[in-house]
Amino acid sequence: MTPLLTARGVCRSYGRHAALAPTDLEVRAGEVVALVGPNGAGKSTLVSILAGALAPDDGLVELGVARPRVGWVPQQPAQYGRLTPRENLELFARLERVAEPEAAAERLLRLVDLPDDGRLGAELSLGNQQRLNLAIALLADPDVLLLDEPTSSLDPRQRRRFWELGGEVRDRGGAVVFVTQNLEELERFASRVVVMLDGGVVFDGSIAEYERSPEADVFA
């Protein structure tokens, strides 16, 4: 099966610090890939490069033959603080050339259960900002959903809803790649685990293989 998304030798340094060593990664339809490892391991750098938000120093990211759509939920708020959630969604819908931006915004507000009470993006709680990030990422019905610690500020109910929406992307033939420090999320949702350490991949295998490996101690 042709991968939806492929990274070949991507790397990134900041001055003399190598944040990401040359790294290869293939993401296939139906996969839910967890990126785990200690802080500074290169997880967020890799996801940002996969999303096209950060240029690698070398290497490349290739999309599959069908040119899959990619949605990205960064760790930090990625919306306009002076706009309401509805205004943010309508703006991003127009940028993504989504048909009927107003209707799309209404649908996504309901989908992520985000209050439409007139508050600006900068006035939202961290949890609601994360839900708005997800709504923006889902606007174009992505085939690949990239998530950087997306549920860290969500309560248990919101977290379950978040993963229901991620599961819908997978179930329609897409894939999810997520950075997490949450062992429960890893065990419940991941089909594949990639462990990173010091800017490189030290393990890549199924969740069952991961649970039998020494790299499972990353959560110890």
Regions found by a protein language model. Name each.
Residues 145-148:
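Catalytic Walker B motif of ABC-type/P-loop ATPase nucleotide-binding domains
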Residues 51:
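Helix-to-loop junction immediately C-terminal to a conserved catalytic motif
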Residues 36-38:
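The feature captures the beta-strand-to-loop junction immediately N-terminal to the Walker
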Residues 174-179:
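Conserved H-loop
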Residues 186-188:
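A short, surface-exposed alpha-helical micro-motif characterized by mixed small hydrophobic
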Residues 90, 102-117:
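Conserved ABC ATPase "signature" region
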